Amino acid sequence: DDSILIVCSEVAPILEYITGIKIPLPYVNKSWTILDQTPWKDITRITAGKMYINGSPMVDIDSIHNWITSPIHTNINEAYEDFRHIWNSVTKTMTPACQAGLTYSGGLDSSIILSHIDDLELYTINNIGKDPIIDCIEDFLTNTEKTKLNVFSINEIEWATEYNQMLSRIYMPASSWSFVGQWIVNKNCKQRVLFTGVGADELFGGYDLYKDLKFNTSGSVSPYSQFGPTELWNKCLSSYNGHAGQATMLMDYWHQVTGVDARGIDLIAGAWGIEPRNPFLAKPIMQLALNLPFEFKVNTVSKPLIRRAFLERWDKSLILPKKGFTGHANDSLPYMNCKFDSTGDRMEDWKIIAQKSFYDCKHN
């Protein structure tokens, strides 16, 4: 019935009511993930912070751009004290009465969640041969925490199996190869609540490349958002009064967090009946991060405020390079349900994998 409007947090249930017809979408970097149109005919995304009337966005309620004001911190020590106070409050408020889990990598972000929330079950993915930090993961943990550590070691064949299983359940392309790690964690999580550290890199300056980018007001120069819509770039630039560095990080937030990671975590956790929680995406933390001076985010070290919080418990020697949920995306190609000749470029190959595997997938 054309008069019926279905609103749902994922695609799969909608396809129980309509005939699913896949339509082609442009795979240019990750920009397609913030388009209103989904890869399914007549299924569109709604925009957060807007009131919809008769299926169309009519009234602005709130926006992340409204949270940006002039920086209030003039020195980094003052900024850190505010961060520490807000972080303590947010993590305390977010701690559930029931048992909870944490996606733990040994990195700065998940570590400062671990240090502020007690009795978490820990879930770690070891993409064999990809993540050297996993080999010393127990160095980060107390004896009690070690008893709560669950490590899932995944090879190329297993990665491909999990990828295909995930794709046939979520009914959407995998916007990032990190989705498979999240899928495995949620699949094995025995708690009703699972914490993650998504968003910290984009909000607090976690990408090393930020230190070397030649920021330009003409558009984002970040590889994560350089193909983003001009209208969105202009809005980000305006929100920061023409500061190209701040605008670029906000563009990355829109693409990487709103478009990919946060949406993927919500979708995958929901598939397993789990509630994801993330202190970094709590409004008080986001407001602080969005209004930090640029040099308090992009400095001689990455994420200086989060790094400082990490060093309150752990030694500097444990700040190690990591690749997170890198996965075996390209290495698993021989075992996946899509065949093509490699381009020789891993990122280009991944785009083809993500697109072809979705359009070729026979959803169950």
Task: Please annotate each region the language model reported.
Residues D42-I43, S178, F195, G219-N364:
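Adenosyl-5′-phosphate
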Residues H73-R84, Y171-S175, A247, M251, ...:
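Short acidic-aromatic active-site loops that bind/stabilize oxyanions
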Residues K187-K190, G197:
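Active-site nucleotide-sugar/metal-binding loop of Leloir-type enzymes
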Residues L194-Y207:
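Short acidic/histidine-rich active-site segments
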